[in-house]
Amino acid sequence: MATVTHSGCQPLNFLEEVILIQTIRFVMRSFVCFALCSCLLAQAQKGPIQLAMIEGMSGPFANTGEAVLRNLVWAVERVNARGGVATADGKRLLVLNRYDSKGQNEEALTSLRAAIDAGAQYVFQGNSSANAAVLMDAIQKHNEREPNKRVLFLNYSAVDPALTQEKCNFWHFRFDAHADMRMTALMQVLKQDIKLKSVYLIGQDYSFGQAVLREAKQQLTSLRPDIQISGDELHPMGRVKDFLPYASKIKASGAQAVITGNWGNDLTLLVKAAKEVGFDGKFYTFYGNALGAPAAMGDAGVGKVLAVAEWMPNVAGAESVKFYQAFKQRFDKPSEDYVHLRMQLMMEALVQAIERAGSSEPLAVALQLEKAEVSMGGQRGKMRAQDHQFQQPLVVGIMAKQGGVEVPFDVEGSGYGFKTVKQFKANEVEMPSSCKMVRPAS
């Protein structure tokens, strides 16, 4: 056996030589193990990308919060099923945590602080424009204070137009058509009803409800000045248990139709009360196609209740049908039948932006999210960089009994679905913005 020597040292004997060789091997193995563990640790430290949904999960609109949660859970599951999000550090999974705001501003802010402390980089909310406004303000201030812990706000339902106009915020992205866009689509259908001569306006008394009634009056004046507004009323949000007095006033006014942006139980109880008092006019709604409203109206709503959305299950097309059936396979209970294509497009847009940025760092992602263009279920939408307002097609549907080619799917097992009345391309409902975006310096 050849001897191992050290410069300036005496030759080693056989035993010393064996010990030295074993020591060298041990050190090398330890080094390789350390390097491997360090690499794995670095990857582990990246971990999953943290998402936080801040929503009213209790209180009068708890069912709406739970319905949104199912949509986001499904979106996250689909992304993770394909391996997660590709970044410069490899594939990373998404993790969604929910926080109960109880629909209150202070609770929403408390939830935001908890989410940030838990490592959330992306905040999702939508079931209150009032909550959205305070979250936008808080997130902007937080991002200025702590640029190393920035977060982005992705809004799926808060549609007060101001949020992407005079109150626009670089850190906020809205994926639902705002109230004026939705009203534009509804009014294009309403104006064709030449028999309609009087309407009653009713809404929830907060920023969104006020915006809906304000825009309804403006568009009626422009498109159908012959229509009389026989009532214009706001009611407390989420606090009215009995809508019979409101329904009685609507019927007594002689109105032939109601225009409302009401959602959740405030809509379900309203249409139920209207049925009880015998009101036989139409309902032009933003959200009358879900969460109990069709079942509450029953046959009385057939041909009478209209709704506007970015997509409905009975929109024609193989891709649309495939999308809806995939959701129904995941959530097969009638009570769980509440799917919004925009929420899936929102998650796909976020994934696209993270992958293009190469990391989950919110500023880098925001710069890519401004350019997002995604498609699913036969629907395509893109983000407008000027104001962070997503541009997508809209559809108006009218309540009908399930059956035939036009209404193959019902809503929540009610036996009633929505037949497509008119579809609008994205550019047909796009509206100018007054947003003066203040962009971060770096």
Report each predicted region and the residues it spans.
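Periplasmic-binding protein-like
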Residues: A115-S129, E146-Y156, S198-G203, G254-G264, ...
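Short, low-complexity disordered leader/linker segments with a strong preference
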Residues: M1-Q50, R113, D117, V438-S442
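Short, solvent-exposed amphipathic alpha-helices that sit
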Residues: T64-G84, R182, S207-D226, A349
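Solvent-exposed, acidic/polar segments of extracytosolic/periplasmic ligand-binding ectodomains
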Residues: E373-S442
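Extracellular/periplasmic Venus flytrap/periplasmic-binding protein
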Residues: E107-T110, P161-A162, N169-G278, N314-K322
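Extracellular/periplasmic periplasmic-binding protein-like sensory domains
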Residues: N169, V271-L345, E355-S360, E412-A441
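Extracytoplasmic "Venus flytrap"
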Residues: A52-A75, Y99-N105, S128, I202-A211, ...
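Beta-alpha junction/loop-to-helix N-cap segments that form part of ligand/metal-binding clefts
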Residues: P48, N63-R70, R82-L163, F175, ...
